[in-house]
Amino acid sequence: MTQFQGVKGTRDIFPDEISRWHYVEGVVHSVAALYGFSEIRTPVFEYTELFQRGIGATTDIVGKEMFTFLPDPNGRSLTLRPEMTAGVMRACLQKNLLSQAPVHKLWYISDLFRKERPQAGRQRQFTQFGAELLGVSNPAAVAEVLTLMMQVFETLGLHGLRLRINSLGDLDDRARYREALRAYFQPYEADLDELSKERLKKNPLRILDSKNPALQEMIMGAPRLYHSLKPESVAEFEQVLAYLDDRQIAYNVDHLLVRGLDYYCHTAFEVTSSELGAQDAIGGGGRYDGLARELGASADLPAVGFAVGMERLMIVMEKQGLFATLNPHGPLVSVIIQQKELAGHAMQVAFHLRKAGIKTEIDLAERSMKAQMRDANRMGSAYALFVGQSEFESGIYALKNLVTSEQTSLDLDAIIEVLREPAARESLRP
């Protein structure tokens, strides 16, 4: 019989790696709480038209990368979410949250799905963390989510990241810019690749996103969106930059940055790392005031957010040695069964230790004491608690420090007090 393999573009995360995920997730949770953001969770699939309207029909995500499957009983096709923002906005509009409070600050850590060519840091099922701030049009809202994102990176110890930022203006600004780009690229249409020719017809801003080396010189000569902005759009962008200056957040203004989703307006940004090679983006985001109207609201809703790829982030952390000091502890104590017939009593001892909040391991396979001790050392247990006939009869147990080899005999209540002491945890081993 053929052995099953995981689906291409997916990966398994085993216990020896999961501590890294827990660490990063914990930092995201704690920093988001500092800024007053609350967690939101949305369904893993939505109606396909949510993404077609929300992300944009001309984007690569909608055109080529969505996992869409058979219609539901009502005849509407469903899609595994390729990004979070459209689903979060749908949830907030459906719940009518903005009528309950004028501002909502939300964060998430969620799995997403795209039909991409699998490679390092780019999977078909992947995880992002992000934040969305709804209801504030002031440039301070952009600075707020940007600062939150950069504080997560700082707390994780990342260095050498580059923040690129640009203004995409409003609808009128972008309409003028699209015409300027068409006028610029049309004389070179024969030199464009097939994808860029298609983008020239549908949305020439997407050409600026091309990674084709043969087009980079042409792209560098393209008109800049900044020159199509009205004075109000320029003033708003400069205010965002002033907030970043006040907070000493370094950035590079990149007037060719457009991002890959059609819902962005005004400020857009991206964070990159040279550790990732050509596909160097860790995350990004921006304003998306028009998304609510696209999804059925009666008016625009000021909103700004970001998303960061967890797998890519963790590749950078690994390359920068940031997991070297992460010490996932083993059990505080391993209960060692000296005689098989005492296994039931030993399990009761382990039960009471765990009820007391003490991380405890016990052998369930009726192996020898030697094998149990070998496992205790392999797992990094700080202590071994021995259960034999004399311990069973007297209620006094031998407790051995596996780091110092010191041993003492105490009743279970006294052992619990010892193991609760901060000094006991100093013996924890990686």
Swiss-Prot record:
Keyword presence, Aminoacyl-tRNA synthetase: yes
Gene Ontology CC, one term: cytoplasm
MF (Gene Ontology): ATP binding; histidine-tRNA ligase activity
Gene3D superfamilies, sorted: Anticodon-binding domain, Bira Bifunctional Protein, Domain 2
Subcellular location: Cytoplasm
Oligomer status and interactors: Homodimer.
UniProt name for this protein: Histidine--tRNA ligase
Organism field: Chlorobaculum tepidum (strain ATCC 49652 / DSM 12025 / NBRC 103806 / TLS) (Chlorobium tepidum)
